[in-house]
Amino acid sequence: MIQTQNYGTGRRKSSSARVFLRSGNGEIVVNKRSLNEYFGRETSCMIVRQPLELVDMVDKFNIYITVKGGGISGQAGAIRQGITRALIKYNQTLRFELRKAGFITRDSRQVERKKVGFRKARKRPQFSKR
């Protein structure tokens, strides 16, 4: 039996996530581990579930995710965008609701590079008048 699935990619900071949406009972697997086991902190798990809770489909899909790069916050944001894109492929009518919540838009903020002569990206060495 061929199982239909919807695919979505998400990116945030330096993380990228591949999300596969299949019909099921609400199981979320990230890199072959359960969602709570992978992230540990509840805030990251909440970020991942946001698009599903918004459209009332928490228990409708099993979600399989592979995510690479970045840290906890970036990976959670990338997964959220991937789930959003997969939901839109599943049902186009959800697009307006997800757009209004701001889940479709890619968060383009990146880490600013360190400049030569500065201690960090913008922190200058201490200024001495005399």
Swiss-Prot record:
Pfam families: Ribosomal_S9
Gene Ontology molecular-function annotations: RNA binding; structural constituent of ribosome
Matches recorded under InterPro entries: Ribosomal_Su5_D2-typ_SF, Ribosomal_uS9, Ribosomal_uS9_bac/plastid, Ribosomal_uS9_CS, Ribsml_uS5_D2-typ_fold_subgr
Membrane-traversing stretches: none
Gene3D superfamilies membership: 3.30.230.10
GO cellular component: cytosolic small ribosomal subunit
Keyword entries, A-Z: Ribonucleoprotein, Ribosomal protein
Highest taxon of the lineage: Bacteria
Stored SUPFAM superfamilies: Ribosomal protein S5 domain 2-like
GO biological process: translation
UniProt family annotation: Belongs to the universal ribosomal protein uS9 family.
Annotated HAMAP family: Ribosomal_uS9_B
Protein name (database record): Small ribosomal subunit protein uS9
